[in-house]
Amino acid sequence: FERKNYFYPDLPKGYQISQYAHPLVSNASFALSSGKHIRIRRIHLEEDTAALTHQQDSSLVDHNRAGAPLMELVTEPDFSSAAEVKEFASEFQTLLRYVGASRARLEQSELRFEANVSLNMGTKVELKNIGSLYALEQATLYEIERQKALLDKGEKVRHETRGWNEVLRETVLQRSKEEAHDYRYFPEPDLPPFAPPIIFDLEALAARLPELPWQKRARFIKEFQLDSEAARLITESPALADFFEQAASELAAWAK
């Protein structure tokens, strides 16, 4: 683990415990419904920050979640539309629920999104702490158009962090974005190095997985003659999918 050093109101002690040089997972991928694969750069553990609620002329700081552990997943810049971003986020939310890793309730901040948008490759704008799939899509769409307008006028896109304002329906500046060297990463002295004692057998782990959402979706389409949209809606929730399957089984038995 490393200390990530920066000063901001959501970080009361001035640094965040994170993983930088040695993430838990690297070089994975996730397939969209189109067959396109989104590369996953890394998955690492770090501690959460406080929650900021921005008002018209002030901001409120909620420290209830500060210091709680979280898992962060970082993708490669493989998305070409806001629709792909939303689909990936939705599918990942469903996957977390199916494997029992998290209830992933957006309204409880159990899952949050941060979208990096870059039309001029190399200069990205990070959209922080987006709390719904709809807001994720709308914020990404707005930021694409904002950057396009700047580039069309011959202006530069600044490397910065922005938030999504639901009332104004636009992204707003939060702070200038730091580079990795600005965080002055160094080993966390209060935590010993984390070295898993075993080599994971990926095939054995895969065999223990439950039926995954896209597998259940394909089976429902074939078994119950559902269209793809109905199958998607039913399988978004493991509980709803189980209820549907049990009801269909009981109805079939009653019909006999």
Where are these regions (language model features)?
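Basic, nucleic-acid-interacting segments
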Residues: 1-210, 222, 228, 249-254
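Extended, structured, electrostatic nucleic-acid-contact surfaces
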Residues: 214-221
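Histone-fold and other basic nucleic-acid-binding segments
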Residues: 218, 228-256
